[in-house]
Amino acid sequence: MRITWFGHSAFRLDFGESHVLIDPFFTGNPAFEGGDAARARAVEGATHILITHGHGDHVGDTLAVAAETGAKVVTNYDLCMWLGSKGLTNFDPMNTGGTTDQGGFKVTLVRADHSAGMSEAGVTVPLGLPNGVVVRAPGEPTVYHMGDTDIFGDMALIQEIYRPDVLIVPIGDRFTMGAETAALAVRKFFAPRAVIPCHYGSFPIIAASADAFVAALDGSGVQVVVPHKGTAVTIA
């Protein structure tokens, strides 16, 4: 599997015939580099878009990318219905605890401790529960993108049920858990092959780097991968 980080919480997973974008926040993302050409490369051939929750920095370019590529959008029911009201037609609604078979892989929505909603005409529209997403494909590492969340004890159940090989962990503080708490979550609940930090280095009011997270996991035996933005890393 090739995993590409585009800054903030935006990722792409490439495996087999599947090309999966998660939280495709390009336009307006201060951490996204390379402009229109990089965006075109990031979305080229996308087959699916997974959205962890209904905030603008995670919904991002979903409508535009879906229109450009024909990618199927997979997210919670409420957010699917809202996107449908904006013209999206190719979507697969689900909810927390549910699993859907996308052909070459399965998606499960799991718990996240956060909020979700978008502002329209000065009114916040609730958009269902926030989630993490677990992606499982035959012969590929299982990936758990936590979305935006704090630590919670039932992460132990996520480990027991899904045994993720790759964790994508928010570390930026303020809107999610910070570096030390995120490191505690990794050490206490999981046994991954690799951990990738996210949700930092974008907006000035969250953490600027992953240094504190890396330091907090030093000596733990956990492999922390801090990718260069736009450059794929391969995890077998």
Curated annotation (Swiss-Prot):
It comes from Methylobacterium sp. (strain 4-46). Keywords: Hydrolase. HAMAP family: UPF0173 (MF_00457). SMART domains: Lactamase_B (SM00849). This is UPF0173 metal-dependent hydrolase M446_4343. It comes from the Bacteria. NCBIfam families: PRK00685.1. Belongs to the UPF0173 family. InterPro entries: Metallo-B-lactamas, RibonucZ/Hydroxyglut_hydro, UPF0173, UPF0173_UPF0282_UlaG_hydrolase. SUPFAM superfamilies: Metallo-hydrolase/oxidoreductase. One of its GO terms (molecular function) is hydrolase activity.
